């Protein structure tokens, strides 16, 4: 299903490019290209609700986490005829979740914190729909996103009366896990940015191509929604 959505998005962008080309040819094209930059950069802060999905033999369970990332990207014009760009960049994302439980009768409190630190390398095809007679542009994109997990761990703190005990487990360490998670994960993404002068907001979705963890029929994959606020220069 998700692969079908990705392919449909690619087809939609190709049809949009073709339609825009015909429109520009019938209307001269020079005015549309006047506002197009050959190269532009973006820097944004992105909040991402992250879903971690575990699947086995047709059954699945999900866990929700929070993600916050700082990202840079550069877009380069691919052709003088159309505002089609190759966009590439890098970002750092911190993902976390905290669960707490307690037993008042025994005076026991348990706090578990899951954290991931991830380097992201996106590569997109982006189209710049400049709205005539305004400073607004709508820029849909579709592409791939490589994720390199630098850190991934679970920290559990148990408090009993005045005593506290802490334990940690790394998801990527063979010392802590017999079959550790994958540090490199590939995903696909689709979204759009709306810019006004040098500012923009963005909304996007990342889906999985490869799994964070896989053992036989059991696998763990992640997906996320991206809500961005940034500047262009």
Locate predicted features:
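Predominantly the C-terminal beta-signal and adjacent terminal strand-loop region
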Residues: 32, 93, 175-233
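Transmembrane beta-strands of outer-membrane beta-barrel pores
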Residues: 47-53, 74, 90-98, 117, ...
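Outer-membrane beta-barrel architecture
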Residues: 69-73, 122-126, 191-193, 228-230
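Short glycine/proline- and aromatic-enriched beta-strand/turn motifs that initiate or cap beta-hairpins
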Residues: 21-77, 232
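Flexible, solvent-exposed loop segments that connect beta-strands
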Residues: 49-63, 93-116, 150-182, 211-225
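Bacterial Sec-dependent N-terminal signal peptides
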Residues: 1-26
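Transmembrane beta-strands of outer-membrane beta-barrel proteins
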Residues: 39-45, 84-90, 119-121, 138-144, ...
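Residues that define the transmembrane beta-barrel architecture of outer-membrane proteins
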Residues: 37-41, 62-68, 94, 111-121, ...
């Amino acid at each position: 299903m998700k692969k079908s959505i990705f392919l449909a998005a690619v087809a939609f962008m190709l049809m949009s490019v073709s339609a825009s080309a015909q429109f520009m040819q019938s209307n001269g094209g020079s005015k549309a290209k006047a506002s197009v930059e050959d190269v532009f950069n973006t820097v944004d802060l992105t909040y991402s609700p992250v879903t971690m999905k575990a699947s086995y033999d047709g059954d699945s369970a999900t866990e929700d986490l929070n993600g916050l990332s700082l990202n840079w990207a550069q877009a380069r014009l691919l052709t003088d005829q159309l505002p089609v760009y190759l966009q590439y960049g890098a970002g750092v994302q911190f993902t976390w979740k905290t669960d707490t439980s307690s037993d008042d009768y025994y005076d026991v409190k348990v706090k578990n914190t899951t954290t991931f630190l991830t380097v992201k390398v996106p590569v997109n095809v982006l189209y710049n729909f400049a709205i005539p007679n305004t400073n607004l542009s709508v820029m849909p994109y579709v592409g791939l996103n490589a994720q390199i997990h630098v850190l991934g761990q679970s920290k559990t703190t148990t408090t009993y009366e005045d005593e506290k005990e802490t334990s940690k487990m790394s998801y990527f360490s063979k010392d802590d896990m017999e079959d550790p998670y994958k540090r490199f994960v590939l995903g696909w993404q689709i979204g759009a940015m709306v810019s006004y002068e040098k500012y923009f907001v963005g909304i996007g979705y990342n889906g999985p191509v490869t799994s964070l963890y896989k053992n036989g029929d059991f696998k763990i994959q992640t997906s996320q929604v991206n809500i961005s606020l940034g500047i262009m220069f």
